[in-house]
Design a protein with these regions (language model features):
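Long, compositionally biased stretches
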Residues: 2-69, 88-140
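Conserved, well-structured core segments that form or line functional sites
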Residues: 82
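Short beta-strand-centered segments at strand-helix junctions
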Residues: 71-78
């Protein structure tokens, strides 16, 4: 399948790389089909979450594993039922600023992807995490 992206032109992607949101990105309820785009130049800490239904819709996601000293999201039973059994990948929506060091990530509402099935959801954690956490604070 060939799809258009907001920032990276046209890309080819196998159907196995389609991510289906059972609980959509907040504010974007009409868009449920996405794919992750990795860029070798920037590593695996930041990826694009590109809509397959709207080429202009794309989010930057950040791997919050660098906050492992204090960020330990717990997935509720309800979310486990929604996502199904499998291995989960947790990503935080990145709000990129001109000065990267002032960028923030949403730790309260991560995007959780079942890596086995491709089912995803943006969830609100019951834990007390900030919606705008400075990306450089607590980074390893």
């Amino acid at each position: 399948m060939i799809y258009k992206t907001r920032d990276l032109g046209e890309r080819e992607m196998p159907d196995s790389k389609v991510i289906i949101f059972k609980q959509p990105i907040f504010g974007f309820d009409d868009y449920k089909r996405y794919t992750l785009i990795f860029d070798e130049e920037i590593g695996d800490q930041i990826v694009w979450l590109q809509s397959l239904e709207e080429p202009g819709l794309c989010f930057l996601l950040f791997n919050p594993s660098q906050f492992e000293d204090f960020y330990k999201p717990k997935i509720t039973e309800e979310n486990e039922k929604l996502l199904g059994t499998g291995e989960y990948a947790c990503w935080s929506v990145l709000s990129l600023k001109e000065d990267f060091e002032t960028s923030t990530v949403n730790l309260k509402s991560p995007v959780i992807i079942n890596s086995t099935t491709g089912v995803a959801a943006q969830v609100i954690l019951e834990q007390d995490y900030p919606v705008r956490h400075p990306i450089m604070e607590g980074a390893k």
